[in-house]
Design a protein with these regions (language model features):
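Conserved SGNH/GDSL esterase-like catalytic core that processes O-acyl groups on lipids
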Residues: 70-164
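Serine-esterase "nucleophile elbow" of acetyl-processing enzymes
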Residues: 26-103, 120
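Catalytic His-Asp segment of secreted/periplasmic serine-dependent ester chemistry enzymes
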Residues: 189-276
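Structural recognition of the beta-strand scaffold that forms the well-ordered cores
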Residues: 59-64, 68, 96-101, 127-132, ...
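A structural motif corresponding to the C-terminal end of an alpha-helix
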Residues: 165-184, 216-233
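Short amphipathic alpha-helices and their capping/turn segments at secondary-structure boundaries
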Residues: 46-54, 110-129, 168-181
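Hydrophobic single-pass membrane-targeting/anchoring helices
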Residues: 1-25
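Solvent-exposed loop/turn segments at secondary-structure junctions
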Residues: 66-69, 101-108, 135-140, 190-195, ...
Length: 276
């Protein structure tokens, strides 16, 4: 919440944008590229159908916000890089990973990014695209004030508006990928706002509303993923448990808003579990 592809640098005029929790982010994008050859001893026996790569390389693209970008996690290996490398190892090919995620991005920003010739070129030759987007679209403070003592129906209008753009993003990514058996993955969120210890410090109303938004959002993302024919990955359960009550503080960076190194490892495992 990224892919033999040549990563084309994309320069976009970005504006500071607050995350759902109201925190501001840097104005720059931080792409990362990892290319490796898998030694015979590290290659899994099975090869993932549809993710065998082409030309001896499996290309992965990451798109989205500060979560896949790796914000607030110093020297982290993001889950985008982990998945891209691991899936290439499974297929006994080289890994080419282009993480085009940008801190602070909203759905509208990704839609603009998808119009860039560089992004279209990158997706055209990618075997796997991983998307995490939507959290920054929610004005959490306003929604908390309005829905603190209401049920889930109070946030549905806010979620519906975001989901329409998420659908368009996924449809455009899928259409842009021309590699045979190319795969699109979209993740949900463990929380669209702050979580763990930091989240609890914001108060019960904040925790109630952000968890409600997250559950409604994730449910709708899963539904449209099924309709469009892309892979949905539940990341809330690995972070917070089946009942949503597990303390995920150790999986988060100090800001309580982004994954820690351990959190990125958990995200990677969740994504890989959904890929054959």
């Amino acid at each position: 919440v990224i892919v033999a592809a040549v990563v084309v640098g994309i320069t976009l005029g970005l504006r500071p944008v607050n995350h759902a929790n109201g925190w501001s982010f840097d104005r720059h994008r931080k792409p990362s590229v990892a290319t490796s050859s898998a030694p015979a001893s590290s290659v899994a026996v099975r090869s993932a159908p549809g993710l065998t790569g082409h030309g001896g390389t499996l290309g992965t693209v990451g798109l989205g916000d500060s979560v896949p970008q790796g914000s607030a996690c110093r020297q982290c290996v993001t889950f985008i890089e982990r998945v891209g490398t691991d899936m290439a190892h499974r297929a006994s090919v080289r890994a080419s990973v282009g993480n085009e995620s940008v801190s602070g991005y909203k759905t509208t920003d990704v839609l603009t990014q998808l119009e860039s010739p560089g992004t279209r070129t990158l997706l055209k030759t990618a075997d796997l695209a991983i998307v995490t987007i939507g959290a920054n679209d929610f004005d959490v403070d306003k929604i908390v004030a309005r829905c603190a003592h209401a049920d889930a129906s109070c946030v549905e209008g806010d979620v519906d508006a975001v989901i329409r753009r998420v659908r368009t993003i996924l449809e455009r990514i899928k259409a842009a990928m021309t590699t045979p058996d190319a795969t699109v993955v979209v993740t949900g969120y463990w929380n669209v706002g702050m979580d763990g210890k930091v989240g609890r410090e914001q108060g019960k109303d904040y925790s109630h509303v952000t968890n409600t938004i997250t559950k409604v959002f994730n449910s709708q993302v899963e539904a449209i993923a099924d309709e469009i024919g892309v892979v949905y990955v539940d990341v809330r359960t690995p972070f917070k448990g089946a009942d949503g009550k597990r303390d995920d503080t150790e999986l988060l960076a100090e800001d309580g808003d982004h994954p820690s190194q351990t959190g990125h490892a958990v995200l990677a495992k969740a994504v890989e579990a959904e890929l054959p």
